[in-house]
């Protein structure tokens, strides 16, 4: 849930006035898995990928977060927590950062900020539940199709005469659904043959999704 634009949301303006604003280039790392959690982040502009790595360094993308989303909120509720995932800039980002200690002080003054954060956490829990269900009940073709539909709803998806256009590599799709890049390529070709999508390099048009 996007909190709103700074010029039209007094609560957001007030919150951001207590934060430090930092800019991150695309593909830079905002949060390292395993580091001590002491800071809450809020995406002012841009989007990020939340991911985990196994012992061999293989990555799995858990989610994408966009403008108006909080990051790193779990450590807010229990001291001594370590970051459970990596967060990497998907695009160039402008991010507001505030210590947990200062955030706790702010919500004493304006509890609405905490309500907004809680609403986001509830929505993410619902998305996670749906993803677990997809892993359990959908085959890899279904998971890829569902992923494309979800990506077509992201803020950085672009309108296209035939649907919605997204930019994503086969490797990234594989990291989301848990399969190889080669498998993704075969399934995208199959979806193309069924006239459900068109795929050219990183550009995919998902038909009929506007």
Swiss-Prot record:
Record domain HTH crp-type: where: 138-210
Pfam assignment, any one: cNMP_binding
Domain of life: Bacteria
Stored CDD domains: CAP_ED, HTH_CRP
Keywords: Acetylation, Activator, cAMP, cAMP-binding, DNA-binding, Nucleotide-binding, Transcription, Transcription regulation
GO MF term list: cAMP binding; DNA-binding transcription activator activity; DNA-binding transcription factor activity; transcription cis-regulatory region binding
Protein residues bound to 3',5'-cyclic AMP 2: 136-137, 171-181
Region (Activating region 3 (AR3)): 53-59
UniProt site positions, description: Activating region 2 (AR2): 97, 102
Protein name: cAMP-activated global transcriptional regulator CRP
Species, as recorded: Salmonella typhimurium (strain LT2 / SGSC1412 / ATCC 700720)
Organism lineage: Bacteria, Pseudomonadati, Pseudomonadota, Gammaproteobacteria, Enterobacterales
